[in-house]
From Swiss-Prot:
It comes from Homo sapiens (Human). Residues 531-543 have a biased composition (Gly residues). Its EC number is 3.4.19.12. Phosphorylated by EGFR. Interacts with ZAP70 in activated T cells, but not in resting T cells. Interacts with TRAF3. Interacts with TRAF6. Interacts with PARK7, leading to inhibit deubiquitinase activity. Interacts with EGFR, ITCH and NEDD4. The modification Phosphothreonine is found at T729. Belongs to the peptidase C64 family. This is OTU domain-containing protein 7B. It catalyses: Thiol-dependent hydrolysis of ester, thioester, amide, peptide and isopeptide bonds formed by the C-terminal Gly of ubiquitin (a 76-residue protein attached to proteins as an intracellular targeting signal). The active site is at D191, C194, H358. Residues 167-440 are annotated as: Catalytic.
Length: 843
């Protein structure tokens, strides 16, 4: 099979003159049908000649070389190696869903354009063609509920969405600020390269299949001009973490650790997975490349590659089945490209989500013209503590390792205060404070340990080795007694609200991985044995708080209005002016000092504002529009096929055990589904547009069955599967027999909530979960397939447990939603009772 595929690829390259990487993409997209691939290539040649704009990053800095045609383009990258993907089913497995999979030809053109304009890993010029905007999902509220839910489960990483929202880490700001948009994690391939896949999806809308970002990351770490400065920042933070666990490295060990970091970023596959029992379903006679899993330092380097800040939304602790926090999750926080001048960076951050050792891009949805919602990302948690600022300390070239580390004077000279951190955020990002309504209260995040109270100050993970306690100020002696009473009262209220919150984090993920992670964590987490928590901040306030609050409110009104106007979209540097009036003679700008004042007040429990970075959302480029339209057309065809299959299954169910009529169906989709031949793409897409309210509901996630769960590593300490190292990240895969991975595993949607104005604001909140049924990773026990448990009324299923009261087992559609034992008892009861309708009336 390999020789045949290589021969076909060689013939295609010789006959068309296309690059090997583009040729492989075209052939794989058409399942190695040469004629179909040639047709796509001709279409690409025509589109490339006249339709696409010369640059995909409109408005970004730096000059761009005009793009040449396919035939005369100079090779700017080495030919793509022949990977060990000898079966065409591998391509279906890797990207069996998503926008980029449905439009492989146009995505191949976009990838080729982006990579052809790429440069080296240095900082003298933009290493890659970087967009200044973020990718947005299309407006799904224009479609009816069934088709919308089909797209949602196809594009959105729903288990991650539910897990992070329940943990109070994601979208908590939407509940307190109705003008903010909800961010959604995009489904991302899990082949060890998910960090770069997520970054590529967040900017361009397609995966990093050509490893373009990974190669740029490796080049910057290996030979970039920032290499030594990056190494110093990494070593400083690692040294502070080692102090927590009592580790001391020799110079040889430091060099070995650094070389290992560079090696992890390599684009060479780590290993290949064949068919074995450890994988979910496996792929017959196929192998797929798996890449080394990356660490938080690689996120920091990626910020320099992209020349833009990166914000990672993640929980802070990994928990076992008992809810015990036993390992920190170090990825969450802010990564600034500090080795690149702020004036040369994009100010709109790239936002990623991290859960269960997997990265996804967080994106918003395209809005209607009359919608006033804004896309923002908070730079504090829900308790108004500033997110960790990773690798922010560079001790300098003159730092003597091993000597200055123990010199308190030298240490104090490099520790960052809260003012310095705020100055960096103001310099690299467009930030602002969003006022909250008087009755708004942010949901509480999960505590670092199940016994920690909400008001306890978590011990800081020594990211950058900095501390903010000095900058927050000491408590006023005159107000200390009263504040202690108020703090104690707030703590009791927060403890009460957190009672159920901790229980919600107990999950099946901890049950399966808890013991193995504990076993492996000792050796793998030795250098990361830091205490959990974010940036440590004192809770005291300076004297004269009331006067300070009045001044802050008066000055904020004028400052906020001017700031919103000044917060432009271009990469404008915010350098602090010298000695501004009214800032107490501070070397930082008045805006920074005002932010410091507001943040101090918020950390004392008087939060009136949210400190956020603004996300730039611009118009899509032509290739993105084409890519989305092709995906919607493909999704419609798959949706119609799925509906027909479900209808056939309903008929079989009703004819077999059937005790009642088929579920009621909406007339709109039925009229379309029964047509043997569909209308053209555009008219078919419009056929799904209805007058439904603008709610956007997320279906409950499911495990997808035991044989098709998505394996992921958890921090460098996952289970050893099939003799592999515990940090291995396995690709997500499902049995090839299933036409769609989601078909049999996603339950029906719960009705969404509506805002007063009828918009979809707030409707993305997941349905309510009972404590007994919800888990920390967002998974639930496998529910009935969509549309099977509607009963006589045709409603979506609202429960998955056995219909028999007080039964802890789960039912199945084949047994009328009883478990097997209760179903047998029910059959025996019905045999004894002449009236079979008692089954319907009783339950």
């Amino acid at each position: 099979m390999t020789l045949d595929m290589d021969a076909v690829l060689s013939d295609f390259v010789r006959s068309t003159g296309a690059e090997p990487g583009l040729a492989r993409d075209l052939l794989e997209g058409k399942n190695w049908d040469v004629n179909a691939a040639l047709s796509d290539f001709e279409q690409l040649r025509q589109v490339h000649a006249g339709n696409l704009p010369p640059s995909f990053s409109e408005g970004s800095g730096g000059s761009r070389t005009p793009e040449k045609g396919f035939s005369d383009r100079e090779p700017t990258r080495p030919p793509r190696p022949i990977l060990q993907r000898q079966d065409d089913i591998v391509q279906e497995k890797r990207l069996s869903r998503g926008i980029s999979h449905a439009s492989s030809s146009i995505v191949s053109l976009a990838r080729s354009h982006v990579s052809s304009n790429g440069g080296g890993g240095g900082s003298n010029e933009h290493p890659l063609e970087m967009p200044i905007c973020a990718f947005q999902l299309p407006d799904l509220t224009v479609y009816n509920e069934d088709f919308r839910s089909f797209i949602e489960r196809d594009l959105i990483e729903q288990s991650m969405l539910v897990a992070l929202e329940q943990a109070g880490r994601l979208n908590w700001w939407v509940s307190v600020d109705p003008t903010s948009q909800r961010l959604l994690p995009l489904a991302t391939t899990g082949d060890g390269n998910c960090l770069l896949h997520a970054a590529s999806l967040g900017m361009w809308g397609f995966h990093d299949r050509d490893l373009m970002l990974r190669k740029a990351l490796y080049a910057l770490m290996e030979k970039g001009v920032e290499k030594e400065a990056l190494k110093r920042r990494w070593r400083w933070q690692q040294t502070q973490q080692n102090k927590e666990s009592g580790l001391v490295y020799t110079e040889d060990e430091w060099q070995k650790e650094w070389n290992e970091l560079i090696k992890l970023a390599s684009s060479e596959p780590r290993m290949h997975l064949g068919t074995n029992g450890a994988n979910c379903g496996g792929v017959e006679s196929s192998e797929e490349p798996v890449y080394e899993s990356l660490e938080e330092f690689h996120v920091f380097v990626l910020a320099h590659v992209l020349r833009r800040p990166i914000v990672v939304v993640a929980d802070t602790m990994l928990r076992d089945s008992g809810g015990e926090a036993f390992a920190p999750i170090p990825f969450g926080g802010i990564y600034l490209p500090l080795e690149v001048p702020a004036s040369q960076c994009h100010r709109s951050p790239l936002v990623l989500a991290y859960d269960q050792a997997h990265f996804s891009a967080l994106v918003s949805m395209e809005q209607k013209e009359n919608t006033k919602e804004q896309a923002v990302i908070p730079l504090t948690d829900s308790e108004y503590k500033l997110l960790p600022l990773h690798f922010a300390v560079d001790p300098g070239k003159g730092w003597e390792w091993g000597k200055d580390d123990s010199d308190n004077v030298r240490l104090a000279s490099v520790i960052l205060s809260l003012e310095v951190k705020l100055h960096l955020l103001h310099s690299y990002m467009n930030v602002k404070w969003i006022p909250l309504s008087s009755d708004a209260q942010a949901p509480l995040a999960q505590p670092e340990s199940p016994t920690a109270s909400a008001g306890d100050e978590p011990r800081s993970t020594p990211e950058s080795g900095d501390s903010d306690k000095e900058s927050v100020g000491s408590s006023s002696t005159s107000n200390e007694g009263g504040r202690r009473k108020e703090k104690s009262k707030r703590d009791r209220e927060k403890d009460k609200k957190r009672a159920d919150s901790v229980a919600n984090k107990l999950g099946s993920f901890g049950k399966t991985l808890g013991s193995k992670l504990k076993k492996n964590m000792g050796g793998l987490m030795h250098s990361k044995g830091s205490k959990p928590g974010g940036v440590g901040t004192g809770l005291g306030g300076s004297s004269g708080t009331e006067t300070l609050e009045k001044k802050k409110k008066n000055s904020l009104k004028s400052w906020k209005g001017g700031k919103e106007e000044a917060a432009g979209d271009g990469p404008v540097s915010e350098k602090p002016p010298a000695e501004s009036v009214g800032n107490g003679g501070s070397k930082y700008s008045q805006e920074v000092m005002q932010s410091l004042s507001i943040l101090r007040t918020a950390m004392q429990g008087e939060g009136k504002f949210i400190f956020v970075g603004t996300l730039k959302m611009g118009h899509r480029h032509q290739y993105q529009e084409e890519m989305i339209q092709r995906y919607l057309s493909d999704a419609e065809e798959r949706f119609l096929a799925e509906q027909k299959q479900k209808e056939a299954e309903r008929k079989i169910m009703n004819g077999g055990i059937g005790g009642g009529p088929p579920p009621a169906k909406k007339p709109e989709p039925d009229a379309r589904e029964e047509q043997p031949t569909g209308p053209p793409a555009e008219s078919r897409a419009m056929a799904f547009s209805t007058g439904y309210p603008g709610d956007f509901t997320i279906p409950r996630p499911s495990g997808g069955g035991v044989h098709c769960q998505e394996p992921r590593r958890q921090l460098a300490g996952g289970p050893c599967v099939g003799g592999l190292p515990p940090y291995a990240t396995f690709p997500r895969q499902c049995p090839p027999g299933r036409p769609y991975p989601h078909q049999d595993s996603i339950p029906s949607l719960e009705p969404g909530s509506h805002s007063k104005d009828g918009l979809h604001r707030g409707a993305l909140l997941p349905p309510p979960y009972r404590v007994a049924d919800s888990y920390s990773n967002g998974y639930r026990e496998p529910p009935e397939p969509d549309g099977w448990a509607g009963g006589l009324r045709g409603l979506p299923p609202t429960q998955t447990k056995c219909k028999q009261p007080n039964c802890s087992f789960y039912g199945h559609p084949e047994t009328n939603n009883f478990c097997s034992c209760c179903y047998r008892e029910e059959l025996r009861r019905r045999e004894r009772e002449p009236d079979g309708e008692l089954l319907v009336h009783r339950f």
